[in-house]
């Protein structure tokens, strides 16, 4: 079971959700990765908290450009993940 979300994580997840609902539909599907960068960000914040989750999200977004091939890039397992990957 993952720890409860910090207020900072909740705020960042809410901002990502606003992007997903209001901005992303206007831009159309263009993410090179699976899961999308915004879904990755939400999952990273849930698994790792605001500091490490934000760092992982920023690194992911910086890789999202035409020179990177993209593909499957899941969030790494968190400290509370019990599933085998």
Swiss-Prot record:
Could be involved in insertion of integral membrane proteins into the membrane. Pfam families: YidD. GO terms for molecular function: membrane insertase activity. Keywords: Cell inner membrane, Cell membrane, Membrane. It is found in: Cell inner membrane. GO terms for cellular component: plasma membrane. Signal peptide: none annotated. Belongs to the UPF0161 family. Its main location: membrane. The lineage of its organism: Bacteria, Pseudomonadati, Pseudomonadota, Gammaproteobacteria, Enterobacterales. PANTHER family: MEMBRANE PROTEIN INSERTION EFFICIENCY FACTOR-RELATED. The keyword Cell membrane applies. NCBIfam families: membrane protein insertion efficiency factor YidD. The keyword Magnesium does not apply. Disruption phenotype: Cells lacking this gene are viable with no apparent phenotype, but they are affected in the insertion and processing of three YidC-dependent inner membrane proteins. It is a peripheral membrane protein. One of its GO terms (biological process) is protein insertion into membrane. This is Putative membrane protein insertion efficiency factor.
